[in-house]
Design a protein with these regions (language model features):
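Polar, glycine-rich mid-to-C-terminal structural blocks
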Residues: 1-10, 173
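Internal maturation/activation junctions in enzymes
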Residues: 74-98, 102, 106, 124-203
Length: 208
């Protein structure tokens, strides 16, 4: 009750499920994930950092109410490239953080204004349609970012610690794909299955 009241009053503390987080860990050969940044959008190894970017979803709301899928994919691809470049441009508070951030080359791509988009489309925040729209946009962004990262790795080489973690990363990506395809079972290495994207509930068929 004390934790709930504190979270309601100040948004802290945050509670994290250690086992679930580490089951989705792409690089466990480097150690377990023990914590996150204060807002919890970055969960990775100790002494690492990444630059963050958020795409404004309302910028892709068309006049007819539909979502600009191609424009959003282009933005996700472009920002993935920008964030990759930023690894070389960033300044870090310690040599260790700088080295590990360079070795793993993590990037943080997200979106903002999902509440505004749902209101503009007349969807309840906690409706099946609202949740499925959010899931579809998130899946599209995640898949585009991973595909763009793979393209860059093909040309420039993978990040330094990829070889050690390749099976884990491919397992996590495969689990993401299963969730995006609506699977309710068959996940690899997960005690708790994720909530899948339900394409039938998504109000914009172009997203699925």
């Amino acid at each position: 009750e004390s934790i709930g009241n504190a979270a309601w009053a100040s948004a802290d503390p945050g509670l994290q499920y250690h086992s679930t987080i580490n089951e989705w860990h792409t690089c466990p050969e480097g150690g377990e994930i023990r914590a996150s940044n204060p807002c919890s959008e970055y969960m990775f190894l100790d002494d690492t950092a990444c630059n963050l970017a958020s795409i404004n979803l309302m910028a892709f709301q068309k006049d007819d109410g539909s979502f600009d899928v191609d424009g959003f994919k282009h933005a996700a691809r472009l920002w993935t490239i920008v964030l990759e470049i930023s690894v070389m441009m960033a300044q870090f508070p310690s040599r260790e953080i700088a080295q590990l951030s360079y070795d793993y080359r993590t990037l943080g791509l997200g979106f903002a204004n999902i509440g505004g988009l749902l209101m503009a489309q007349g969807l309840s925040y906690d409706s099946k349609q609202g949740r499925s729209l959010c899931a579809a946009i998130t899946a599209l962004m995640t898949g585009t970012a991973y595909a763009t990262s793979a393209e860059m790795a093909k040309e420039m080489g993978a990040f330094a610690r990829y070889a050690d973690n390749a099976p884990h990363m491919l397992r996590v990506i495969a689990n993401h794909r299963r969730a995006a395809m609506g699977a309710t079972d068959g996940y690899d290495g997960l005690e708790v299955a994720p909530v899948p994207l339900l394409a039938a509930d998504c109000p914009d068929a172009s997203l699925v």
